[in-house]
Amino acid sequence: TCKSQSPIMNHISLFTDENGNLDIDRSAQNWIDLGNLFAMLGVGFHSMYCARPTGEHHYFTRPLADINKVFNKVYRSLASINRPSRYITMTSSAGKISMLGTVELQGEKLFALKFNEARNMEWMDKVYLARYDERQNTIANLVPYGADKHFYEDELHEIENMLHDSIESTRHQQ
């Protein structure tokens, strides 16, 4: 089986209206057409993912809130056999994170997030919350809900320091 992973990219697969705002309907229709084309070709529509936060990320991305609106419209418009996997994903230093959607807790709108892949396998499938932000375009930069930092941040810092030390040690041995 052939499967497709497709990046959600501004200026390529997302369209803006005359005011520069994301055109949710037109952008979603672009993805719906792609999903139907994949089905006709026998290609599985595996996933839609956000551009990695590297290089020209600011040019190719849109706010996560907008991307979530497009994804939800695509997901609800395609036949089940033509749909992408259930969630939008984005890679971060901590791992591959899915945006499950939004929830409201005590009157506050939040993003629900989950690790699909992680630097520490104990983080896998763990759901956590971050404050809803209409402008943020990177999952790793979302503000944690109910805490000063995300549950994984201290351990991630330790992992990254160990990796750095290991690389430096290897360099000095050569």
Predicted feature descriptions by range:
Residues 36-174:
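Auxiliary Fe-S-binding modules of radical SAM enzymes
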Residues 1-30, 44-60, 90-91:
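Conserved strand-turn element in the central/C-terminal portion of the radical SAM core barrel
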